[in-house]
């Protein structure tokens, strides 16, 4: 018994030395785990001898001794194999080589430089969950240890294994666990990434990417075009046969043909914001302009990335009193495959529109254009 006490004292003294050293060398971490293995062996031997205490310490049960010994052996062997790689010169702290870190997702891998990823389920800020994205992941293969980089997209959190993505957090499964499994939004490093199902309601399938599709969200002032553009909309037949124009997007089910005519205000014309009518001081006739509309509203066109517009439009729900209506994401019909999406917001007055632009923060990546529209 005295022999076990002396050995345990010597072992634990050396363990405390490594705690105080706080080394970042891989060789020191290997020596530390070798001492932990030795400590577990002493406790196991003491339990076999029916010893309840040793050096005023309670001896763990046989099951606990075995479990801790297996953990120490697993980490010790993994570190011994890691020292034979090119990664042995990197900084390895006691935290990096702890068993808890080793068994954190992705399990049985060493990880460094974690970043918190917050996921909001079902558009409910009260229903959130935090996950960790690791910048570097060291994983074991048949040929030895390899180093991959971690990242996050709309599908989940992953690390690279060569040219492949190894997901260790699946947002779809997490959404089914914590919500309805339909909608989720990923917040990481100032970016917002929406799930594909949430985006697809207003985006065509060939414009959706499950990778990093969201633009950085910024509270800076939005670039605003101060040109007032009268826009007339007629839901009748197209003015030119064979050139029918429609709004693109899978959620657009308009059966009537919409012709949008944009015209800058000509010299001699002015916009009267009191009665919302367009006046001409020259008395001339302007073809293509319909001034017989019953109602004219003030609008803001938001133009930018389709996914960013989708996320931004969802945030508008918190400010319903600041606008009248908001459209779905639409595009001009053209041969340009890289065209940006457009969202149109209507207002009752200039004051309401100004209050909206002052209250709602628009990302810098989205351009806003002011104008009026006849309904």
From Swiss-Prot:
SUPFAM superfamilies: E2 regulatory, transactivation domain, Viral DNA-binding domain. There is a cross-link at residue 303 (Glycyl lysine isopeptide (Lys-Gly) (interchain with G-Cter in SUMO)). Residues 296-375 are annotated as: DNA-binding domain. InterPro entries: E2/EBNA1_C_sf, Nucleotide-bd_a/b_plait_sf, Papillomavirus_E2_C, PPV_E2_N, Reg_prot_E2, Regulatory_protein_E2_N, Regulatory_protein_E2_N_1, Regulatory_protein_E2_N_2. GO terms for cellular component: host cell nucleus. It is found in: Host nucleus. The keyword Flavoprotein does not apply. Residues 266-283 have a biased composition (Polar residues). Keywords: Activator, DNA replication, DNA-binding, Early protein, Host nucleus, Isopeptide bond, Phosphoprotein, Repressor, Transcription, Transcription regulation, Ubl conjugation. GO terms for biological process: DNA replication; DNA-templated transcription; regulation of DNA replication; viral DNA genome replication. Residues 264-292 are annotated as: Disordered. Phosphorylated. One of its GO terms (molecular function) is DNA-binding transcription factor activity. Plays a role in the initiation of viral DNA replication. A dimer of E2 interacts with a dimer of E1 in order to improve specificity of E1 DNA binding activity. Once the complex recognizes and binds DNA at specific sites, the E2 dimer is removed from DNA. E2 also regulates viral transcription through binding to the E2RE response element (5'-ACCNNNNNNGGT-3') present in multiple copies in the regulatory regions of the viral genome. Activates or represses transcription depending on E2RE's position with regards to proximal promoter elements including the TATA-box. Belongs to the papillomaviridae E2 protein family. Binds DNA as homodimer. Interacts with protein E1; this interaction greatly increases E1 DNA-binding activity. Interacts with protein L1; this interaction enhances E2-dependent replication and transcription activation. Interacts with protein L2; this interaction inhibits E2 transcriptional activity but not DNA replication function E2. Interacts with protein E7; this interaction inhibits E7 oncogenic activity. Interacts with host TAF1; this interaction modulates E2-dependent transcriptional regulation. Interacts with host BRD4; this interaction mediates E2 transcriptional activation function. This is Regulatory protein E2. It comes from Human papillomavirus type 26. The lineage of its organism: Viruses, Monodnaviria, Shotokuvirae, Cossaviricota, Papovaviricetes.
């Amino acid at each position: 018994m005295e022999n076990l006490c002396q050995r345990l004292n010597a072992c634990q003294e050396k363990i405390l030395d490594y705690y105080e050293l706080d080394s970042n060398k891989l060789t020191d971490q290997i020596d530390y785990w070798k001492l932990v293995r030795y400590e577990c062996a002493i406790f196991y031997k003491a339990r076999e001898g029916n010893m309840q205490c040793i050096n005023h310490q309670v001896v763990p049960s046989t099951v606990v001794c075995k479990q801790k010994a297996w953990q120490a052996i697993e980490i010790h062997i993994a570190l011994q194999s890691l020292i034979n790689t090119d990664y042995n010169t990197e900084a390895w702290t006691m935290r990096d080589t702890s068993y808890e870190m080793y068994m954190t997702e992705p399990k049985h891998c060493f990880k460094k430089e974690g970043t918190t990823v917050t996921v909001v389920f079902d558009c409910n800020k009260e229903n959130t969950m935090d996950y960790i994205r690791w910048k570097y992941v060291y994983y074991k293969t048949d040929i030895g240890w390899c180093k991959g980089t971690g990242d996050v997209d709309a599908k989940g959190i992953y690390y690279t294994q060569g040219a492949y993505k190894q997901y260790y957090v699946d947002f779809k499964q997490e959404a089914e666990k914590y919500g309805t499994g339909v909608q989720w939004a990923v917040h990481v490093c100032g970016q917002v990434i929406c799930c594909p199902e949430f985006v697809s309601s207003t985006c065509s399938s060939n414009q959706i990417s499950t990778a990093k599709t969201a633009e950085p969200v910024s509270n800076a002032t939005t670039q605003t075009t101060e040109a007032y553009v009268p826009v007339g909309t007629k839901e009748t037949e197209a003015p030119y046969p064979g050139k029918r124009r429609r709004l693109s997007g899978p959620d657009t089910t308009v059966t009537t043909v919409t012709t949008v005519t944009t015209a800058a205000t000509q010299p001699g014309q002015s916009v009267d914001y009191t009665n919302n009518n367009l006046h001409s001081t020259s008395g001339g006739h302007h073809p293509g302009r319909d001034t017989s509309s019953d109602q004219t509203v003030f609008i803001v066109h938001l133009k930018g990335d389709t996914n960013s517009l989708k996320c931004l439009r969802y945030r508008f729900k918190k400010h319903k009193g600041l606008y009248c209506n908001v459209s779905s994401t639409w595009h001009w019909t053209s041969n340009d495959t890289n065209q940006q999406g457009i969202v149109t917001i209507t207002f009752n007055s200039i004051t309401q529109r100004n209050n909206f632009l002052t209250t709602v923060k628009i990302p810098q990546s989205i351009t806003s254009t002011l104008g009026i529209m006849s309904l």
